[in-house]
């Protein structure tokens, strides 16, 4: 009986030790996005701090609109162990092999407009990081609506930081 209780206590201690660390406190070490420990932890592709809204819109081009997205879901992020002569050849060709960053689906996006200053003589440069603290994305101009779709993909978006 003593052995089973000792084994149980040892097993519980090993489980507690193997658990990942708890979430860091707000503003503490590890609460940022890995780039100088600042910003939102959901932002995977950050943009430079000195980039303006006008520069970001130019990077998106005329076929896409600059958007600020509250939610991003990333699929992928896998490490594959392939065996055999041609193991993993197909997945590496389509870009889903080891180290693939996965597909980012953005949701709850709002358009970021380039505002015209009221005082014409004073140039104002709005920094993109001051306008949007979440995921900054270039969303395709599309008249489609995904409100009643099963999958719900109306506006395909690409993270701005991934194309810089």
From Swiss-Prot:
GO terms for molecular function: structural constituent of cell wall. Its main location: secreted. It comes from the Eukaryota. Keywords: Cell wall, Conidiation, Disulfide bond, Glycoprotein, Secreted, Signal, Sporulation. Residues 1-18 form the signal peptide. Glycans are attached at residue 50. It is found in: Secreted; Secreted, Cell wall. Induction: Expression is repressed during growth in liquids, whereas several days of growth under aerial conditions of solid culture induces expression. InterPro entries: Hydrophobin, Hydrophobin_CS. GO terms for cellular component: extracellular region; fungal-type cell wall. Disulfide bonds join 60-138, 68-132, 69-109, 139-157. The keyword Secreted applies. Aerial growth, conidiation, and dispersal of filamentous fungi in the environment rely upon a capability of their secreting small amphipathic proteins called hydrophobins (HPBs) with low sequence identity. Class I can self-assemble into an outermost layer of rodlet bundles on aerial cell surfaces, conferring cellular hydrophobicity that supports fungal growth, development and dispersal; whereas Class II form highly ordered films at water-air interfaces through intermolecular interactions but contribute nothing to the rodlet structure. Belongs to the fungal hydrophobin family. Self-assembles to form functional amyloid fibrils called rodlets. Self-assembly into fibrillar rodlets occurs spontaneously at hydrophobic:hydrophilic interfaces and the rodlets further associate laterally to form amphipathic monolayers. This is Class I hydrophobin rodA. It comes from Penicillium camembertii.
């Amino acid at each position: 009986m003593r052995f089973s209780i000792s084994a149980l206590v040892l097993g519980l201690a090993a489980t507690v030790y193997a658990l990942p660390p708890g979430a860091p406190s707000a503003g503490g070490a590890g609460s940022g996005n890995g780039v100088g420990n600042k910003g939102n932890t959901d932002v995977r592709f950050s943009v430079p701090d000195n980039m303006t809204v006008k520069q970001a819109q130019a990077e998106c081009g005329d076929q896409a609109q600059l958007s600020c997205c509250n939610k991003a879901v990333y699929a992928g992020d896998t490490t594959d162990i392939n065996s055999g002569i041609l193991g993993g050849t197909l997945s590496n060709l389509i870009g889903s092999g080891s180290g693939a960053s996965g597909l980012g689906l953005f949701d709850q996006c709002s358009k970021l407009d380039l505002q015209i200053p009221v005082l014409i003589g004073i140039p104002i440069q709005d920094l993109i990081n001051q306008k949007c603290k979440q995921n900054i994305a270039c969303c395709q101009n599309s008249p489609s609506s995904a409100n009643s779709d099963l999958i719900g993909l109306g506006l395909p978006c690409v993270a701005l930081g991934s194309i810089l």
